[in-house]
A protein has these predicted regions:
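Conserved active-site segments centered on acidic
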Residues: 2-77
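Phosphate-binding/catalytic loops
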Residues: 94-148
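Conserved small-residue
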Residues: 20, 60, 86-87, 128
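Secondary-structure transition/capping residues
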Residues: 38, 42, 67, 82, ...
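Generic alpha-helical secondary structure signal
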Residues: 54, 81, 119-122
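Structural signal for conserved beta-strand scaffold positions within catalytic alpha/beta enzyme cores
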Residues: 43, 88, 106-109
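Mid-chain, well-packed structural core segment of small domains
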Residues: 72, 78-101
Length: 148
């Protein structure tokens, strides 16, 4: 059987936080850079803040990733249903984060950057980058395991 000409379904990773204004937006930006072929990133929040945190935009631009055109989005059931992997960026309140009710959610527990110093937001950015790189590497490994 030839796989030539067949298109595999694009796999989706959903990054979730409350406001979808910084952590999940940075993760989406990094995933777009590091994702293996065939993967798509989406970020969303339970109570979107509106504009993306300008400090998050700034610290991402410092390393050559532009998230200024990304939009804060409310999480929808179809996003959850259609996601292959879901990352909870760090919300711990079950009332504000439905990701806590879903099985197979990866918990990252990343500190909220809102109101933090520029240096602290850079540290948070770097933490997110390392986690996204590891996630991308893990996805490559798992996609290389073929079951017959």
């Amino acid at each position: 059987m030839s796989l030539q000409g067949s298109r595999a379904k694009e796999r989706t990773v959903l990054f979730v936080c409350v406001e979808n204004a910084a952590r999940s937006q940075m993760a989406e930006g990094f995933f777009r850079k590091y994702a293996p072929e065939g993967y798509l990133a989406i970020s969303a929040g339970t109570m979107p803040a509106g504009p993306i945190n300008p400090v998050a935009i700034q610290v991402m631009k410092e390393i050559g990733i532009d998230i200024s055109e990304q939009k804060s989005k409310i999480i929808r059931e179809d996003m959850i249903r259609n996601s292959d992997d879901m990352i909870n960026m760090g919300c711990v309140d079950k009332q504000s984060c439905p990701a806590l009710f879903i099985n197979n959610v990866i918990e990252w527990g990343i500190e909220e950057p809102k109101g933090k110093s520029l240096e602290k937001v850079r540290e948070i950015r770097d933490d997110i980058e390392q986690r996204v790189k590891q996630l991308a590497a893990d996805l490559v490994k798992s996609s290389q395991q073929v079951n017959y």
